[in-house]
């Protein structure tokens, strides 16, 4: 299966679970302490990263999605540091601050790429009333299309059954990264993502793939799940659903440096993809591709849609789909570094017809990559008047992204794409119709940067206006 990249700007995910702060002290070591037989590290750098459920939220936000995070913290400096870091990454935090508990913090001392010691500052949260977290969930559920419950057995999910029931009552799917052998506590969830060790802790030793499928189906039926996604390390992943054939996804990892946080990445990409409307099998394929990227990085890590797109398609393949402006600029820079010629065009593309397809195919033939900039709904309304667009922005972009000729689709809200074009600066800017080159928005900027501008002919007899009039007139 080769999935297409969704528009993660349209995704909204609520993450509830055990939030943590990972701290790293890094420096060289060249001697042994005279006080004890331990190395002395001269700390030169320190780094802070959100961990646990906070890492899941950070992954959703890194894709461009709306991430809402609920969890338990202390009234302390680590809580402030965690909140500041997450909010700078556009994660919406709604923490329950408890005066008698510390924020879970893990301090790692590193030297020469090796971890010398880890110091944990934590106390498992216990006997915490359900109301503070449930009320925060209830306030956020109308804003999201998926819920992730991230369980590290630290106490934030003490009332997990109430959380599942609230989400299902709101009609929102619930994805759970489980901890421990008690799957009963997750009864009624949409999907669990156990790794192979966690799965075998519940069902016993798995002999082969057939045995995996049989035991997985039993788990689904016993605990009223809709699906299981079993992550299997070098063997990839297996998606199991009731009364459906299993989907085995081979690993896409090229090199494995660190599996830390890979489970967080899997469930974040899975939930974010489903929240954009992707079917479950395609969302799992995207999560599998994402896992292949992050295990090649050191420590808990996020990935961008550019990295995910390249994992899906390969850097030389047909395209990366819907993308935002910031990531487009980065992608174009990488394309130039590969020596690729980048072509750009723009339009409303309200009702895609044969003329559009001929035009885009012609534009794509003029270079190695084709960008299509699309007017948003508000922009189309100003240009075309009442009743337009017929199709909203996300649907128009989805159709364009499905064309083999198109690499990237990006929205713009202004009346013209001049600002966007001047930021991207394609190698070649093309426009269809009978324009003079001097009148094409962004043309002067492209030429000034050493690029070209061309006008392409439209196919005769094809127009969106003509199609709309024909429909109104009842003609086929």
UniProtKB/Swiss-Prot annotation:
UniProt binding sites for ATP: 195-198
SUPFAM superfamilies: Nucleotidylyl transferase, Ribokinase-like
Pathway stated in the Swiss-Prot or TrEMBL entry: Nucleotide-sugar biosynthesis; ADP-L-glycero-beta-D-manno-heptose biosynthesis; ADP-L-glycero-beta-D-manno-heptose from D-glycero-beta-D-manno-heptose 7-phosphate: step 1/4; Nucleotide-sugar biosynthesis; ADP-L-glycero-beta-D-manno-heptose biosynthesis; ADP-L-glycero-beta-D-manno-heptose from D-glycero-beta-D-manno-heptose 7-phosphate: step 3/4
UniProt entry tagged with the keyword Cytoplasm: no
A single GO cellular-component term on record: cytosol
Family annotation (PROSITE patterns): PFKB_KINASES_1
Pfam families, per database record: CTP_transf_like, PfkB
Protein name per Swiss-Prot or TrEMBL: Bifunctional protein HldE
Species this chain originates from: Aliivibrio salmonicida (strain LFI1238)
């Amino acid at each position: 299966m080769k999935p297409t990249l969704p528009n993660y700007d349209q995704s909204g995910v609520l993450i509830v679970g055990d939030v943590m702060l990972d701290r790293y002290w890094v420096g060289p070591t060249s001697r042994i302490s005279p006080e004890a037989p331990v190395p002395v590290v001269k700390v030169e750098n320190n780094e802070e990263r959100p961990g646990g459920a906070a890492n899941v939220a950070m992954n959703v936000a890194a894709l461009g999605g709306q991430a809402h995070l609920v969890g338990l913290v202390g009234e302390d400096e680590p809580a402030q540091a965690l909140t500041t870091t997450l909010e700078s990454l556009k994660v919406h935090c709604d923490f329950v601050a408890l005066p008698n508990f510390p924020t879970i913090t893990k301090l790692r001392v590193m030297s020469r790429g090796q971890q010398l010691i880890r110091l944990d500052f934590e106390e498992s949260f216990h006997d915490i009333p359900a109301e503070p977290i449930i009320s925060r969930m209830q306030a956020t559920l109308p804003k999201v299309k998926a819920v992730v419950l991230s369980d590290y057995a630290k106490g934030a999910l003490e009332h997990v059954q109430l959380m599942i029931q609230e989400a299902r009552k709101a009609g929102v799917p619930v994805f759970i990264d489980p901890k421990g052998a008690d799957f009963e506590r997750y009864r009624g969830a949409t999907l669990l993502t156990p790794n192979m060790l966690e799965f075998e802790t519940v069902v016993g030793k798995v002999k082969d793939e057939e045995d995996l499928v049989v035991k997985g189906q039993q788990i689904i039926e016993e605990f009223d799940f809709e699906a299981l996604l079993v992550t299997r390390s070098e063997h990839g992943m297996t998606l199991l659903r009731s009364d459906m054939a299993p989907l085995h996804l081979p690993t896409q990892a090229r090199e494995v440096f660190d599996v830390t946080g890979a489970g967080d990445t899997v469930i974040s990409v899975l939930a974010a993809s489903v929240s954009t409307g992707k079917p479950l099998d395609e969302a799992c394929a995207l999560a599998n591709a994402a896992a292949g990227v992050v295990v090649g990085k050191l420590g808990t890590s996020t990935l961008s849609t550019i990295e995910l797109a390249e994992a899906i398609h390969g850097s030389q393949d047909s395209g990366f789909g819907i993308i935002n402006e910031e990531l487009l600029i980065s992608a174009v820079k990488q394309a130039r570094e590969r020596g690729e010629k980048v072509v750009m065009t723009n339009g409303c593309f309200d009702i895609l017809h044969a003329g559009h397809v001929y035009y885009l195919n012609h534009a794509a033939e003029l270079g190695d990559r084709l960008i299509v900039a699309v007017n948003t709904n508000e922009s189309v309304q100003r240009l075309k008047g009442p009743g337009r667009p017929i199709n909203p922005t996300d649907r128009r972009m989805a159709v364009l992204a499905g064309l083999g000729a198109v690499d990237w689709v990006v929205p713009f809200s202004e009346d013209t794409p001049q600002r966007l074009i001047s930021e991207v600066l394609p190698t070649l800017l093309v426009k269809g119709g009978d324009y003079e080159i001097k009148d094409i928005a962004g043309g002067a900027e492209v030429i000034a940067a050493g690029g070209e501008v061309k006008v392409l002919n439209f196919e005769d007899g094809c127009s969106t206006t003509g199609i709309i009039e024909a429909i109104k007139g009842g003609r086929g």
